[in-house]
Amino acid sequence: MQEKKINRTNVQLEALEIAKANKRCGLAISMGVGKTRIAIQHLQYCYNPLIEVLVVVPTHAIAGSWFTELDKLNLGNLSKHITFTTYISLKKHNPNDYDIVYLDECHSLLYNHEIFLSQFKGKILGLTGTPPKHSDSEKGIMVSKYCPIKYKFTVDQATDSNILNNYKIIVHQLELSKTSSLKKSKKNGGQWFTSEFKDYHYVSNRVAQANPGKQKQFAAIMRMRALMQYNTKELYVKSLANKLNTKCIIFANTQKQ
C-alpha cells in the first residue's frame, strides 16, 4: 500500500477540519505551512453577512500577513468583518461584539487576558508555531483553557515532508565592545556612557539575582532589549547578511529592524 504523501495542502485541510469540529481549539503548526490561510478558510466556513471577528496579534505588523493572504485568496471583502487588536489592548474590547476570536501566536496568552476571554462566549481558534512547553506555566494554562491544542505539525515534520527546506542552526558568539560609547539615560534626564560589555554584564546579573517568576521574566526581557540596542550586534548581523548567497528568511524583533 502506497504511503500518503504529506504536502502543505493536506496539512491545511486536516487542520481546518479540526478547527471546524471544535468550538475552541488551538493549532500548533510550523511556520511556512499556512496558519493564516487556515484561519481565513475557517472564517469562510463560519461566514454569515453579520459576522464580526476579532484577530488578536502580538504586534500590528503581523496583521499585514492577514491582508496579504486575503488578497491572495481574492477574499478582500472579508476584511470588513475583521477587527485587529494586540494582546496588550485586548481588554479594551467588548466580548459581546464578536462571534469568533482568532488568537494569532496564541502562546502570547497571559492571565490578564482573562478579563476579555472569561466573558467571551463565541468560538476561539488559536494559532501558534511554538506551543508552550510546560502545561503548568502561565501560558500553558491559558492555552489549555481557551484554545487547547488539538492539532500539531512541527518544523521537523514540515522539513521531513519537504514543505520546508532543511535547515541548520548556527550559534554566533558576539564579542561586545569594551569602548565606553553606549549612551544611557538617567531618571533625572541626565546621560552617561558605558560599554556594551559592562552593560550586558550588569543586566545579566539582574537576571541572575531576580526572584523566580515574573521578576525574572521581566529582567530577562530587559536584557534582551539591551542586546537589541547594541551597535556591535547590528554591525555583525549586517556583515552576515552581506555574505548570504542563498534564499533565506530573516527574523527581527521589530519592523524597524
Kindly give the residue locations of the regions a language model identified.
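P-loop (Walker A) phosphate-binding loop of NTP-binding proteins
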Residues: 30-31, 58, 253
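SF2 helicase catalytic motif II
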Residues: 94-133
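Short hydrophobic/aromatic beta-strand immediately N-terminal to the Walker A/P-loop
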Residues: 25-28, 54, 249
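Interdomain helical connector at the RecA1-RecA2 junction of SF1/SF2 helicase-like NTPases
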Residues: 137-246
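Conserved helicase motor "Helicase C" RecA-like lobe of SF1/SF2 P-loop NTPases
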Residues: 249-257
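Walker A/P-loop
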Residues: 22-42
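Conserved pre-motif I regulatory segment
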Residues: 1-28
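Inter-Walker segment of RecA-like/P-loop motor cores
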Residues: 56, 60-97
